Amino acid sequence: MFYYLIAPLKNKTPPLTYFSKEQHPKGALVNIDLRNKTLLGVILEEVSKPSFECLELEKTPYFLLPFQIELAAFIAQYYCASLSLALSLFTPFKKCDIAKLEKIEPDLSALSQTQTNALNALQQHSISLLFGDTGSGKTEIYMHLIAQMLEQKKSALLLVPEIALTPQMQQRLKKVFKENLGLWHSKLSQNQKKQFLEKLYSQEIRLVVGTRSALFLPLKELGLVIVDEEHDFSYKSQQSPMYNARDLCLYLAHKFPIQVVLGSATPSLSSYKRFKDKALVRLKGRYTPTQKNIIFEKTPNFITPKLLEALKQAIDKNEQAIIFVPTRANFKTLLCQNCYKSVQCPFCSVNMSLHLKTNKLMCHYCHYSSPIPKICSACQSEVLVGKRIGTMQVLKELESLLKGAKIAILDKDHTNTQKKLHGILNDFNAQKTNILIGTQMISKGHDYAKVSLAVVLGIDNIIKSNSYRALEEGVSLLHQIAGRSARQISGQVFIQSTETDLLKNFLEDYEDFLQYELQERCELYPPFSRLCLLEFKHKNEEKAQQLSLKAAQILSLCLEKGVTLSSFKAPIEKIASSYRYLILLRSKNPLSLIKSVHAFLKTAPNIPCSVNMDPVDIF
C-alpha cells in the first residue's frame, strides 16, 4: 500500500491522507471521497502509513507539471491563501501522443537597427524590461524572441490584457506562427477550451497568447514568457488568491530556466525602479516616423466648438478619431441642483450611473438598477442633472452635432461577448466607423492606420482621485491614448484638462514622468514600501467594525519588526450590503509582511478576512 497527502481542489479543507495500491508521482490528479462527495485532489507527497484508517483514491490521467506545483506553493505562501485554493487555479496536463514537431520557418519582418540592438540586449538577461514608446515596434521584437524559442523546440507564452487580444493582433500572430498559435481568454466556450487543450497536450500549440489565467496552463518545455502592457492593473486578481500574474512570471524566472520579458510604453513605477539600473532596454521613437501635434483645452465643458471642428476636419479628410472617456453610461451620477444630493445605491456607498438607453440608474458595483427618479428624494426638487459625462452621452451629443457620422462605442456595456468586441474593432479597422468612443479599453494596443485624432476627455477625474497612483495612472493613460493616433499618418492629440501646466511636462518622454514620480512619491507607498490590505466585512456595520478591531489587537501581537498597522473604515464603506473595514500593513521588507499575516491567520482562524498582498489601490 502507498499513502499520500492530498490537497482537495476548490475546497477549504486542509490536505488529507488517502491510500492507493499503486504508486503515483507528486502532482498527479486523483479522485477522492470527502463528505459523501467525489472531488479532485492533487498528490502533494508520499507519507508513512498513518495510525488511522484511510479511504482509497482513484487515479486519473491528469497531472500538474513541476513548474505549476512550485508556482502554486509560492502563491499560497506569498498571497496568504490555502494551498488547495492556489492549486485550483491550474489546468492540469494529460499524457497523449505528441504531434510531430515541424520545423518552424516564420515569415518575420526584418528589424531595424534600433530593434535589433534592443533584441540583442534582451537576450543578455533572464529577466528584463522592454520600455518602448508607442509605435516603436515592440511586437516585432516579441515575435523574433518567440520564433527563436520555438526553433529550440520550446514553448512560449505571451500574456496580454483581455482587451489587447484584438482581431488585428490575432491575425498578425496567426500569419507568422500559423497552427502553432493558440489563444486563451475568458470568452472561450467550454468546447473551444477543450479543443485548445487537446492541441496543447499534443504540443501542436507551442505559442499561447492569453490573458492572466494563461499562466496556469500546462505549457511543457516553457522557455519564454512575455508580459505585454506590464503596467496594466488587469494582471492583478481581485479574488482570492489575489495574485499578480506579472509578478508570478518574475518568480518563475528565478526558479526555472525561463526567460521573462516585461514590455510597456508606460511601465509601472515599480518595474521601472526595479530594472532601471540593470536590465532596462529602452526603445525610443516610432517605427514609422510621423508628425503629432498636441492641443490642450482648459475647459470644464466637453463637446466644445474647438473639439467639434477638429472632429469635422478628420472626417472630411476621410480619417478617423478615437475619444477616451473614463466613464461608461450617460453620466456617472444624477445630482439635485437644489440640495446637491446625488442618488446613491441602497446597497453600496456609491452613486448610481445614469443609463438613458434603458431609462434606469445602475450601480456598477452590485448591478442593482432602478427607474430614473423625476424628483429628489431629499428635497422634492424636480431639477435633477447628470454629472461626469460618460460614453453614451458623448455618443448622443455627437450624433446630433455630426449628422451622418458613423460612431461606435467600445466599453464594457457594448463588448459583453467576443463577437461584439470583434465586430466593433473590425468595423473600425475597415473604416466603416468614423469615430470610436471608449473607456480605458480604447488605450490597449490598437493600431489603426487612419486614426489622425486622439481625444482625451475627463482625465482630471483620474489624476485628482485619492489613489496614491492617481498621477501615474493618468499620465500613463495619456501616453497610451496619444499613441493610438498618427501611427502611419500625421495627426493630433486633443486633451481637455485644467492641469495643462503639469501634464505638458510629461508628454514628450514618459521616462521624464517616471523620474519625477520617483522623487515625489511618498515613501509610505510602493515602490518604496510594500503593502498588504486585510478586508473585514459583515452585513451588520457594528459587527464589521468589531471584527477589524479584534483583528487589529491580535495582529499587533503578531507583527514582525518594521511592520506598521493602520485600521480604518473603507473609502467605499459598503458594497453589496456588506459594510467594510480595512487594516493596512506596511513594511520595507515583504517577508516581514508575509510572516505577520501568516501568524495572524494561524492565531485567529475564525476571524473571516480577505488578504490582498501588493494591492494596486485602496478602496
What are these regions (language model features)?
Residues 45-47, 91, 325-327, 411, ...:
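A general secondary-structure junction signal
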Residues 127-150, 154-206, 210-543, 582-583, ...:
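Inter-lobe coupling/hinge segments of SF2-like helicase ATPases
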Residues 514-522, 559-571:
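Short amphipathic beta-strand starts and helix->beta connectors
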